[in-house]
Amino acid sequence: MVNIRPEEISSIIRKQIEQYNQEVRVINIGTVLQVGDGIARIYGLDKVMSGELLEFEDGTIGIALNLESDNVGAVLMGEGLSIQEGSSVKATGKIAQIPVSDGYLGRVVNALARPIDGKGDIPASEFRLIESAAPGIISRRSVYEPMQTGLIAIDAMIPIGRGQRELIIGDRQTGKTAVATDTILNQKGNNVICVYVAIGQKASSVAQVLNTFEERGAMDYTIIVSEPANSPATLQYLAPYTGAALAEFFMYKGRHTLVIYDDLSKQAQAYRQMSLLLRRPPGREAYPGDVFYLHSRLLERAAKLNSQLGEGSMTALPIVETQAGDVSAYIPTNVISITDGQIFLSADLFNSGIRPAINVGISVSRVGSAAQIKAMKQVAGKLKLELAQFAELEAFSQFASDLDKATQNQLARGQRLRELLKQSQSSPLAVEDQVATIYTGVNGYLDILSVGQVRRFLVQLREYIASNKSEFTEIVKSTKTFTDKAEKILKEALQEYTELFLAQEELEKTKS
């Protein structure tokens, strides 16, 4: 047996005493009184804060929303089927936050930023609060750069700028999602990070959008945040804030971002469900009193940052669904008053074959021509006026039997201009192609064609310019201006191609 000297023992004990650290941890614990419908009532937790995350015995996470005198009302972020009455709940001392990194690009995640596309974990070293404060007045600058959507009707008449919030509003099945997804497709090569937030959508619809993005190579710069219709209301309520937090991560790094919220009506319904189950007093249309704040604090996070903060931007395109075209309902009026303009999609236009079904008369952009390149301003000025006059004349001409020649000509021009605005889904146009198309219409080059020939003529004209008059495209692209030289080249192309097109049509007629 080894002899141990007493002083060795005492020195070991002394070292251990020195290393001993009496750490006191206070854990705030409560007891579940009642649970069901995604809501838990908890007794205790007297030090809990509003919005704090709670952890239940089975690992489910909840958010404390109602702090009452004798209990706490919490919403569950999950099914919570194994939570029982009497089980304990612990306050975590944290509020909802998500991991963020460049690794999220090309991935599909849920409202807690966890991947749901089966491609493994996403590495992230940084965290952002799901609900963070919007940039202040001093942190912003006015919107001045265009955010091209690739849709002629929008880019020419309802222009959107980087940092703007533009509402897309219309009945179901009028092409709202198509306008938003086309805008994402058009950002290819523009160094814009896109976030598509699907709230309460059918999983099949989200899969279709994902498929389109993958086919067109748009997932390289896009993140999809999805909480389908079968998700708990809490997660549907959180999804838009998660999308905004992911976009903010890139915005504060000086990047340009675009966020689509599809759609905020579903988020408001999820929030209404949570509020009614928490027994908060209902207001108009049974929505809680703070439903305006729900959307305003989300949309105010979209901004164009000043040069000290890196000139990044977040452009928001919220979507709201109306019932039978009623724009004066509660949620539509709220979101219209928060945003910088709205694009109104009409079911009547959609059904009559005008797609995208944008009602140019009541759609508006409050940023206006500040968000257009000079070339677009030069050619698009006449377009909105001529279309407005045409709409007025068309309504009037239904009652008049004999119209004078000038009126007939104006109606004919209007019909061709309306045809010019039609575009197929998932085929956004570059801005130089849009300039050529609008110039062709407003300067009467389509007047000699029948309405049925217009779209075919324009598609082939754009191909002709690309292959034979590429100098025009280069001038508009590099100078962002419709110069005299560009106009001269375009006029030549129009004269040459119109003759060619009419000769081809004549040849086909004689063949048939």
Curated annotation (Swiss-Prot):
Record CDD domains: ATP-synt_F1_alpha_C, ATP-synt_F1_alpha_N, F1-ATPase_alpha_CD
Record-marked site positions (Required for activity): S363
The keyword ATP-binding appears for this protein: yes
InterPro entries, per database record: ATP_synth_asu-like_sf (IPR023366), ATP_synth_asu_C (IPR000793), ATP_synth_asu_C_sf (IPR038376), ATP_synth_F1_a_nt-bd_dom (IPR033732), ATP_synth_F1_asu (IPR005294), ATPase_a/bsu_AS (IPR020003), ATPase_F1/V1/A1_a/bsu_N (IPR004100), ATPase_F1/V1/A1_a/bsu_N_sf (IPR036121)
Membrane protein topology class: Peripheral membrane protein
Major location category of this protein: plastid
Binding-site residues, ATP: G170, D171, R172, Q173, T174, G175, K176, T177
Enzyme Commission no: 7.1.2.2
Keywords: ATP synthesis, ATP-binding, CF(1), Chloroplast, Hydrogen ion transport, Ion transport, Membrane, Nucleotide-binding, Plastid, Thylakoid, Translocase, Transport
Reaction(s) this enzyme catalyzes, per UniProt: ATP + H2O + 4 H(+)(in) = ADP + phosphate + 5 H(+)(out)
Pfam families, A to Z: ATP-synt_ab, ATP-synt_ab_C, ATP-synt_ab_N
Compartment list: Plastid, Chloroplast thylakoid membrane
GO MF term set: ADP binding; ATP binding; proton-transporting ATP synthase activity, rotational mechanism
Top-level taxon of origin: Eukaryota
Any one Gene Ontology cellular component term annotated for this protein: proton-transporting ATP synthase complex
PANTHER family in the record: ATP SYNTHASE SUBUNIT ALPHA, MITOCHONDRIAL
Subunit (UniProt): F-type ATPases have 2 components, CF(1) - the catalytic core - and CF(0) - the membrane proton channel. CF(1) has five subunits: alpha(3), beta(3), gamma(1), delta(1), epsilon(1). CF(0) has four main subunits: a, b, b' and c.
Protein purpose: Produces ATP from ADP in the presence of a proton gradient across the membrane. The alpha chain is a regulatory subunit.
Family: Belongs to the ATPase alpha/beta chains family.
Name by which UniProt lists this protein: ATP synthase subunit alpha, chloroplastic
Gene responsible for this protein: atpA
